Amino acid sequence: MFGTEIRIEEEKASLVKKEFKIKETELLSKIKKETTIDVDIWAARSVAQVFDRLGVDYPRTPKSDEPSFTQNWLVNCSNPIAQLVRQAREINKFHSTFIDSIQRYVHKGRIHSEINQLRSDQGGTVSGRLSYSNPNLQQIPARNKEFGDKIRSLFLPEE
């Protein structure tokens, strides 16, 4: 295991996190305006209350008959509230997983991530390919143009 330093724009990270939180709050406000319910987007029972209020049928788990709101169902649901829930979840994931992780590990404008070459109790892979930990920089999103680009823009090249 060895480490490397990666420059981070700390102020921009705080601004991007704030921007993401504002967008998430706006989406949750739209849901509340339509349904009068303060929804917890990660709690299936809370999301179920929203769809019950709207009269929208939703899937349930086979064993426990609990509501189930997978990303696939939210993407394919024609109700606009489902899209708002999906977008709010996505934004929440970006700021709570990625930006919080960057902010937690930054020290004097740099992240000192660990690179694992071989499998061990602390990380690594069986195949010998490299893996990162603390934070895992290989998980930074690339597919989402809007949010992924903003998160990746926090990383700066060496001068």
Language-model features, listed with the residues they occupy:
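Conserved "right-hand" nucleotidyltransferase catalytic core of DNA-directed polymerases
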Residues: 1-148, 156-159
